[in-house]
Amino acid sequence: MTLLALGINHKTAPVSLRERVSFSPDKLDQALDSLLAQPMVQGGVVLSTCNRTELYLSVEEQDNLQEALIRWLCDYHNLNEEDLRKSLYWHQDNDAVSHLMRVASGLDSLVLGEPQILGQVKKAFVDSQKGHMKASELERMFQKSFSVAKRVRTETDIGASAVSVAFAACTLARQIFESLSTVTVLLVGAGETIELVARHLREHKVQKMIIANRTRERAQILADEVGAEVIALSEIDERLREADIIISSTASPLPIIGKGMVERALKSRRNQPMLLVDIAVPRDVEPEVGKLANAYLYSVDDLQSIISHNLAQRKAAAVEAETIVAQETSEFMAWLRAQSASETIREYRSQAEHVRDELTAKALAALEQGGDAQAIMQDLAWKLTNRLIHAPTKSLQQAARDGDNERLNILRDSLGLE
């Protein structure tokens, strides 16, 4: 059994590739079924966010394993293998465990130490358990990563300052508009990222927020919290002209806001500027919108400069966190090695118990037939000793014949011989 982590993220691939490799929530079950149908895959978890798509797998070693998994990923998303290979990373066993712990702890995020990723990792794990999870080692790896992430946040200052993609989007808005209290903000979506954006905006005294979402119920809960109006996605076209700032983050596979829609809104606004921050993958706003005069479009990749400004205060904490991850990875791998030996131990114990039961049954039968008890017990002890030491004796003899002193010493140590 081998543990693997493979995928792409914001550091290795542009948003144009990340959106093509992402797994939409409504097709995740189908993707997991297809993945687990691969003969080498014992268990799998798919993590797909704005900034990364990763597969965490428990697999049987085989020739061309990497080729087979890359081919599956490319076939599933209809990708050119060469395009994917340039951006794909591949971690195995110790490195896979360490990578997951770093991801869950926010150490591999666009925003160092951001807490949202832990919730996303947990959701990916829960989704994988709905009839898909098969490998206990993979399950244990995820459970361990959750406890490590909690330890990192408790024992370091990695989350001391409020920095996230949502926070960066709000920072960008504050840089462009002198005061947010007089602007109208349209939020598209009602997921976790938009929730964070809405709360940040409320803290900065935004008076008018409109939330457009596919389902009204979820949007209404957030709207009640931040004092916003709720509209349907179909109403965006007619209401877009009211918005000075549009921040969008949905799971839609196709753009929601097109160039024509923004052109009409700008005309109605007499070309007053609009800021559009698209933090969705795949993108919610057509890239061509950025070519329009007075439409200022930013993607998740464009937020990098803002986010970079906030990294300094977290770097010292990250060093401490990396030490924790290294320690916890080492402990987990020790547990994993012990698990791999446990089946051998069970087999060895079962074999010894079988010999014991077989010889004891024969001895008891001999006693019932009136045999001499002392002779029967001596015979039992002799046969039991010979049967139990037969295999170790053969191994010692073979090691001696081969002149393999290292193996001989290992066997001596295993048998408790000084």
Swiss-Prot record:
Catalytic residue list: C50 (nucleophile)
GO MF, any single term: glutamyl-tRNA reductase activity
Biological process per Gene Ontology, one example term: protoporphyrinogen IX biosynthetic process from glutamate
Catalytic reaction list: (S)-4-amino-5-oxopentanoate + tRNA(Glu) + NADP(+) = L-glutamyl-tRNA(Glu) + NADPH + H(+)
Keywords: NADP, Oxidoreductase, Porphyrin biosynthesis
Record function comment: Catalyzes the NADPH-dependent reduction of glutamyl-tRNA(Glu) to glutamate 1-semialdehyde (GSA).
Name under which the protein is recorded: Glutamyl-tRNA reductase
Pfam families from the UniProt entry: GlutR_dimer, GlutR_N, Shikimate_DH
Residues that coordinate or bind NADP(+): G189, A190, G191, E192, T193, I194
Domain notes: Possesses an unusual extended V-shaped dimeric structure with each monomer consisting of three distinct domains arranged along a curved 'spinal' alpha-helix. The N-terminal catalytic domain specifically recognizes the glutamate moiety of the substrate. The second domain is the NADPH-binding domain, and the third C-terminal domain is responsible for dimerization.
Keyword Transcription regulation (UniProt): no
Residues binding substrate, per UniProt: T49, C50, N51, R52, S109, E114, P115, Q116, Q120
Domain of life: Bacteria
TM spans (from-to): none
Description of how the protein assembles with itself and partners: Homodimer.
Similarity comment: family membership: Belongs to the glutamyl-tRNA reductase family.
Involved pathway(s): Porphyrin-containing compound metabolism; protoporphyrin-IX biosynthesis; 5-aminolevulinate from L-glutamyl-tRNA(Glu): step 1/2
EC number: 1.2.1.70
Miscellaneous notes: During catalysis, the active site Cys acts as a nucleophile attacking the alpha-carbonyl group of tRNA-bound glutamate with the formation of a thioester intermediate between enzyme and glutamate, and the concomitant release of tRNA(Glu). The thioester intermediate is finally reduced by direct hydride transfer from NADPH, to form the product GSA.
Class of this enzyme: oxidoreductase
PROSITE patterns, A to Z: GLUTR
InterPro entries: 4pyrrol_synth_GluRdtase, 4pyrrol_synth_GluRdtase_dimer, 4pyrrol_synth_GluRdtase_N, GluRdtase_CS, GluRdtase_dimer_dom_sf, GluRdtase_N_sf, NAD(P)-bd_dom_sf, Shikm_DH/Glu-tRNA_Rdtase
Residues of the site described as Important for activity: H99
Gene3D superfamilies on file: Glutamyl-tRNA reductase, N-terminal domain (3.30.460.30), NAD(P)-binding Rossmann-like Domain (3.40.50.720)
Organism encoding this protein: Shigella flexneri
Record gene name: hemA
